[in-house]
Amino acid sequence: MAPSAKRSGPRKQKRNVPSGVAHIQSTFNNTIVSITDPNGEVIAWASAGSSGFKGAKKGTPFAAQTAADNAARRAIDQGMRQIEVMVSGPGSGRETAIRALQAAGLEITLIRDVTPIPHNGCRPPKRRRV
C-alpha cells in the first residue's frame, strides 16, 4: 500500500479584510452567495446546494437564507465587517438573503440590483405551456 502523501502546497491563509462586496445570484432553481474583497477576489461563498438542500428545495427563500448565513459566517471569520450587496437574478431568495446577511452581523452600506437586462438582444425561449 502506498504511503499517505503529505500536503506541501501553500495553505489558504486567513486574511483580514474589513470590507467587501456580497454578490447574490438568485435564480428560480438555486441561490449562490459569493463574498469578495473590493478587488473581486472571492473570500467566502455558499449556495443553497452546498448548504445541504437538494432538488426543488434549493429555490426556496429559506435555502437562500441558509446559504447567505453560511457565507456571512465564513466572511466574518476572515474579519469582514461592512459589505456592499449586488443582487442579480429573478429568484425568490433575493430579499431573504439580504436579510440573512444583515442578521449575521454584517453592516450593509449599499444594495444594488445588477440583473442583466437586454436592450433587445437574443430571442428569448418560447413560453412554457403547462
Curated annotation (Swiss-Prot):
<comment type="similarity">
    <text>Belongs to the universal ribosomal protein uS11 family.</text>
</comment>
<keyword id="KW-0687">Ribonucleoprotein</keyword>
<keyword id="KW-0699">rRNA-binding</keyword>
<dbReference type="GO" id="GO:1990904">
    <property type="term" value="C:ribonucleoprotein complex"/>
</dbReference>
<keyword id="KW-0694">RNA-binding</keyword>
<protein>
    <recommendedName>
        <fullName>Small ribosomal subunit protein uS11</fullName>
    </recommendedName>
</protein>
<comment type="subunit">
    <text>Part of the 30S ribosomal subunit. Interacts with proteins S7 and S18. Binds to IF-3.</text>
</comment>
<dbReference type="GO" id="GO:0006412">
    <property type="term" value="P:translation"/>
</dbReference>
<dbReference type="InterPro" id="IPR036967">
    <property type="entry name" value="Ribosomal_uS11_sf"/>
</dbReference>
<comment type="function">
    <text>Located on the platform of the 30S subunit, it bridges several disparate RNA helices of the 16S rRNA. Forms part of the Shine-Dalgarno cleft in the 70S ribosome.</text>
</comment>
<dbReference type="Pfam" id="PF00411">
    <property type="entry name" value="Ribosomal_S11"/>
</dbReference>
<dbReference type="GO" id="GO:0003735">
    <property type="term" value="F:structural constituent of ribosome"/>
</dbReference>
<dbReference type="InterPro" id="IPR018102">
    <property type="entry name" value="Ribosomal_uS11_CS"/>
</dbReference>
<dbReference type="GO" id="GO:0019843">
    <property type="term" value="F:rRNA binding"/>
</dbReference>
<dbReference type="InterPro" id="IPR001971">
    <property type="entry name" value="Ribosomal_uS11"/>
</dbReference>
<dbReference type="GO" id="GO:0005840">
    <property type="term" value="C:ribosome"/>
</dbReference>
<keyword id="KW-0689">Ribosomal protein</keyword>
<dbReference type="InterPro" id="IPR019981">
    <property type="entry name" value="Ribosomal_uS11_bac-type"/>
</dbReference>
